[in-house]
C-alpha cells in the first residue's frame, strides 16, 4: 500500500506543479494574499537544535544569516537560541566557547542565547518543549533549524507569518 500512496502523491504533485497557475496557492489557499514584502514587526525566535555536533560549521552557517538580518535593520526583532543536548564534554566545551564568542560579536545587533541540557529528555522534541516553557511567550514566531541547516536572511524575512497571521495557527 505504501508504494501506491507514494505513486499517487507524486502523480498529484506533478499535476499541480505542471498545471496550476500558482502551485503554492493550489495547496495552501491562505498564501494567496501574501506578497512577500510585508514589514517585519513581530518578534521571532530562531532555534538551532544541536547534539554532539562540532560547532564550527554551525557558526559558519549562522554568520551570513546574522549579517543579513542586521543589514536589513531588523536584528532587534530576532533572537537566536542555540539549544544543545550535547553529552560529550569536549564538544560541549567547544560549543560554549564558539557560541559565546558568536554572541559577543553580535551583542549589539542580534541577541544570541546558548543553552545546554544535561539530560536529553524527550530528544529534539523535548529540547524544543524546554525552549517553549522558558522563552516561548517572549516571541510571536519561531523558526527551527537543525545543526546542518543553512538559511539566508532573505529566506527568514520572506517568512509568511506576518502576511497572514492565521497561517500556522
Give the ranges of each region predicted by the language model.
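Internal catalytic domains of large membrane-associated glycosyltransferases
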Residues: 5-169
Amino acid at each position: 500500500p505504501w508504494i501506491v500512496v507514494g505513486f499517487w502523491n507524486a502523480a498529484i504533485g506533478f499535476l499541480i506543479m505542471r498545471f496550476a497557475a500558482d502551485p503554492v496557492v493550489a495547496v495552501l489557499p491562505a498564501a494567496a494574499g501574501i506578497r512577500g514584502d510585508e514589514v517585519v514587526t513581530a518578534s521571532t525566535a530562531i532555534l538551532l537544535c544541536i547534539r554532539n555536533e562540532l560547532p564550527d560549521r554551525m557558526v559558519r552557517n549562522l554568520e551570513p544569516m546574522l549579517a543579513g538580518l542586521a543589514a536589513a535593520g531588523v536584528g532587534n526583532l530576532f533572537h537566536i537560541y542555540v539549544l544543545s543536548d550535547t553529552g560529550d564534554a569536549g564538544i560541549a566545551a567547544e560549543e560554549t566557547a564558539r557560541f559565546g564568542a558568536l554572541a559577543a560579536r553580535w551583542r549589539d545587533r542580534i541577541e544570541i542565547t546558548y543553552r545546554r541540557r544535561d539530560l536529553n529528555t524527550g530528544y529534539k522534541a523535548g529540547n524544543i518543549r524546554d525552549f517553549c516553557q522558558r522563552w516561548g511567550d517572549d516571541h510571536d514566531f519561531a523558526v527551527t533549524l537543525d545543526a546542518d541547516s543553512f538559511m539566508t536572511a532573505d529566506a527568514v524575512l520572506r517568512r509568511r507569518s506576518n502576511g497572514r497571521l492565521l497561517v500556522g495557527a
